[in-house]
Amino acid sequence: SVVQSQNGANIGAGASGISVVQSQNSPNIGSGVNGVTVVQSQNGANIGSGASGITVVQSQNGANIGSGASGISVVQSQSGPSIGSGVNGVTIVQSQSGANIGPGVSGIDVVQTQTLPNLSPGANGSSIVQVQTLPDIAADAGNVHVVQVQTGGNKVFGNSATNVRSRTVQARSNENVGSGLANPSSAGKGPTLHADTLARNLSTSNVEVVATRGNAHVGAPLSWDSGNGLTLTAERGDLRINGALTAQGENASLTLNAGQRPLRIDNSLSLTGQGARVEFNSDKGYALAEGTRITLSGKSAGFRANGRDYSVIQDLQQLRGIDRDLGGSYVLGNRIAGGNSSFLSIGNASAFGGTFDGLGNTIDNLAVYGTGAYSGLFSVNRGTLRNLNLERISADGAQATHYNVQVGSLAAVNLGRIDNVNASDIRIAAASKLNSLGGLVALNLGSIDNASASGTLVGNRHTYALGGLAAENISTARGVASISNSRADFAISGQLKDHASHYGAGGLVGRNRGGLIRSSGSQGTLSLSGHGMNLGGLVGYSSAGGLADVSASVDVSGNGQRGLYGGLIGLNVNSGIAHARASGKVRGTDAEALGGLIGRNLNAAINNASAHGDVSLQAGRYLGGLIGHNQAGNLANVSTSGNLSGGSLLQAGGLIGLNANASLVNASAKGNVATRGAEAVGGLLGENLYGSVINGSASGEVTDGSGKTLGGLIGSNLGGNHSNLKASGWVNAGANSDVGGLIGHNRGGNHSTLAASGNVTGGKGSRVGGLVGYNDAASLTNVSASGNVSASGSRAIGGLIGSDLRGSLMLASSHGIVNDKTGHNLGGLVGRGENTSIRSAKASGAVSGGAGIRAGGLVGSLEGWQALILGASAGGDVTAGYDSYIGGLVGFSTATISGASASGKVGGSGLLGGLVAWNQGNVMGSSASGRLEPQIPNQIHGGLIGINFGWQSWNSVYGAAATVPMIGRHYNL
């Protein structure tokens, strides 16, 4: 052993069992030396030819290893060693600079070198492991493996290199950039094998590129004219073809192997020579990106995938030949132009049960027909149809003999799988017999994924189901029918069979029964005539199914009686909906229910849905910006933004026309609602029956000159418990209506945190309130209104509530002006109350009326033995005309009033009271301070009470009210 030698030891030939440790200068090791270990040598050792079993550890400069040396390890050498010709079994570990490997070297491992070694011609069986940049592989190098390359460089294949396997993974700067054929400009981003280099090698030899751990991506176009083959493999990572590959040679081949991940073809592949072959192998299958195609146009072309051979279809005659083996495997090798020729459906009366892969190619300009019940390119599909484009396919079912004809461009019936099929410029028309029409398929009992269809569909009076993608999507005992990642764009017109109540027409699907529709949408137009139709921008009729992440931008128009029309679904029964959007206009005449999203929704929950188109219904029953009629369907996170207009209707709402037994959470409507003669109209809900709304808002104008109940949020409400509601639009009603800034007519329920800020206008005989027009036996807590309230000849008008019966108000306020020159009961808070309880309330707006009225700064008229005011105040001026009861707090009262005050001016030519004009109840612990301004001589007026027929105690007057008698006239009962 030599330890800590400043100058390197010279070890003679034949020496054995010697260790050199910490030698500043490297030792010279002679030929034939065996079993010597050199440790921590600053300069690299010179190892003679034939030396064996020697280990050099931590040498700053690389060792020079002579020819024929074997079994030698060089560890942590800063500079790469030079390895002579014929050296065998040498391992280079952690060398900063790459080793130079001589010709004929075999079995060498280079591990973790910062720069790549140069492999001389004839190097065989070598492995380069975890190198930072890629090697230059010389001509004639064979079976060379490059493993775990960390950053970019060039694998330069010599003119005669054969069967070179390139294993390149783990790009340090970007691990998602795997090895493969990349654009030369990306050389610094990851391991790169240049396309031009590879093409030169393909001209003379077969080439295989393998990624053992990382990704393999083809990033640039590659073409070759020879008959050689290219094999690309990603054993664990992604294999993606991003650049076009083209081979024109006879018998050329392309093999793509993706071991553990799907094979992704993002650019076109074209092998046009005779006998050319393509093979795909992947445990997870392969997928073609939109617009990508694989061309196999040469004679005797072949295709194989995962061990299965496919027949290549290249013309109509071969397409027709599928009838001879309906269970076979087929690919479409190139575009087929049909020349508008008639084509009998594949299978006709029999089902296709094999696989047909279009490889992204197109079948164009065919008139397909069937002689039985089915008309389509395929009559019935039980197998797999994928990666196919259809253009200018027409069908009408006219030659079918069955009484019920199903017509689609791709297939009449699908019981199998359809994937990545696109049909454009499709023309489907109805036959003169019972029929269903689909842009892609008529009846789907299987699965459709990543499909699209566009064109025209024309129904007639015999058409019972009609859909842009599928007429019907129906689950059976065999399994769930599904449509996903699919779209349709059709102009749908004509007629639909009358009163086909369990069918319908939709932009995507006519009828969905138990099926699933996900991540799909439709656009275009749908305009049909017929009675009792179910029309939807996406689905006409859906029952017991599910829809998620769906949308429709279809203008829907129906002409007929008793129809159900929706921007998304016409009739929805027990079909849950999540993440849905509709943006088309929806119009109808004399329909049963019409909605921007759904016409009628029964027992179906909806979450995260919106509608953004204008809706209109000239006559009918239910009209809603989102849903016309909602029965027992709970909604969450729903909204609308379109305008709504209608004629003589029962219920109309900016969100829902009629909502029954359903809760709404986070619901909003933006847009104007205008009807003529409707029963109930609201900015959010037309009528609500026993439903609850939490966090609801509306911000548009609500108008109906002859409607019965109008509310800025809800027209008519029965029951339910609402909270956090607000409305901000102007509400304008005509005669004999209940109209409120938030609710027109409210009966029952416990409601809290309600607010309205818009102005409210009513007509003769109306009950008008800034918040609620008429409130019956309902509890309202923490409620407010700030808009001005006006009418002409109303029955009751109030800044908060027009008329209240047996209601309870707590923490209530109003701030708007109340005005009706010909009304009957006017109040700053409540116009008229009967057995009403008011606690902790205030009103600050002025109240003004005409002759013969009851007017109060808080309540115009409050009657009933249960009527109560506790802790309330009024600050607005109150004025009225002759023969009126005019009070700073209450005009006419039989109630108990305690802890109340009034500070506004009280004036007019009627009975005046600073607090109460006419008291038949009990006033105690209350006060008044406002000025009294009588208009005629001997007019009765009092600073606290004008005329007292009841009781009063512990009351006071001050300020201007103290300058007149506290009680104008007192009568003992």
Language-model segments: which ranges?
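Long, low-complexity repeat tracts used as extracellular stalks/passenger repeats
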Residues: 2-201, 206, 260
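Surface-exposed repetitive/solenoidal architectures
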Residues: 102, 125-973
